[in-house]
Amino acid sequence: MRSLSGLLLLLTACLAVNASSVPTLPDDIQVQENFDLSRIYGKWFNVAVGSTCPWLKRFKEKMTMSTVVLIAGPTSKEISVTNTHRRKGVCESISGTYEKTSADGKFLYHKAKWNITMESYVVHTNYDEYAIFLTKKLSRRHGPTITVKLYGREPQLRESLLEEFREVALGVGIPEDAIFTMPDRGECVPGEQDPVPTPLSRARRAVLTQEEEGSGAGQPVTNFSKKADSCQLDYSQGPCLGLFKRYFYNGTSMACETFLYGGCMGNGNNFLSEKECLQTCRTVEACNLPIVQGPCRSYIQLWAFDAVKGKCVRFSYGGCKGNGNKFYSEKECKEYCGIPGEADEELLRFSN
């Protein structure tokens, strides 16, 4: 469920946002199929967030992972929400209630002070591992806001779940640079204060650049020199907190695979596209790999080397989980796999 105090703080700041800066709120939000309310109860860690609210990007460096506990509410029509988080160096806990609706997986929160009703939807969950919540708010005066949050039963989640969350957020119009993970500083006890930094740590912080600190505010860094020399490195997410989709070359599978880049530092095995990755890192050994369409259904017409026929052939690439035997033109395929051109073939016939 939405982090209650974090949600209210976010939406308060967003009241000053003009409606023209955010997308139209979707009307056809699909909740988790066969939603089971009793299984969503318990403690969740707020692992990642994305929002159309510009305030979020300005203050995301101050946000850390919080916990949310959901239990049955004081009435059969409500659920209770308790959020525990750090705010201004002090751990605090705030409780509230959400109203059930006739649609399973959809809840309402009404703030009389602002005369705003927020709608929250459980769009994806497997109950035991993760849950993705989408909240939309419409202010008649200031327009719509969409916020998506990823929760986990544990502070760390599989990268495939982070990718699923990212796709959900992008799908409702949230910009890529407004989607990020929450730094995990551990759970806190309400009332306790964060330790005061020592003079030594203050001095060290003063000389660090924003990228070295890993604030999450840095821009993607991909201008490494001699990127081909980095192809055998393991991928590096870097210390920042963004969720930027990138490609890295896997020397074992001889394929370019996706990973989520934090937005700063990392290494040179980091590419914006599969094409750039393959054309930088692929070797001639790729010509001996099988032709793999992959499970996705984009049906992109590419070229591959057919080792049985001994020539380059067209094939339909699904768009994901292929291998290095994938070329973007017939010429490229022939150059990699040693197929002679027409002039070369004529020369060979003449010399024989």
Swiss-Prot record:
It is an enzyme of class 1 (oxidoreductase). Residues 231-281, 287-337 form the BPTI/Kunitz inhibitor domain. One of its GO terms (cellular component) is extracellular region. SMART domains: KU. Expressed by the liver and secreted in plasma. Transmembrane segments: none annotated. Residues 1-19 form the signal peptide. 3-hydroxy-L-kynurenine binds at C53, K111, K137, K149. It comes from the Eukaryota. The precursor is proteolytically processed into separately functioning proteins. Disulfide bonds join C91-C188, C231-C281, C240-C264, C256-C277, C287-C337, C296-C320, C312-C333. Glycans are attached at N115, S215, N223, N250. The record marks L241, G242 as: Inhibitory (P1) (chymotrypsin, elastase). Its EC number is 1.6.2.-. GO terms for molecular function: heme binding; IgA binding; oxidoreductase activity; protein homodimerization activity; serine-type endopeptidase inhibitor activity. Keywords: Cell membrane, Chromophore, Cleavage on pair of basic residues, Cytoplasm, Disulfide bond, Endoplasmic reticulum, Extracellular matrix, Glycoprotein, Membrane, Mitochondrion, Mitochondrion inner membrane, Nucleus, Oxidoreductase, Protease inhibitor, Proteoglycan, Repeat, Secreted, Serine protease inhibitor, Signal. The record marks R297, S298 as: Inhibitory (P1) (trypsin). Pfam families: Kunitz_BPTI, Lipocalin. PANTHER family: PROTEIN AMBP. In the N-terminal section; belongs to the calycin superfamily. Lipocalin family. This is Protein AMBP.
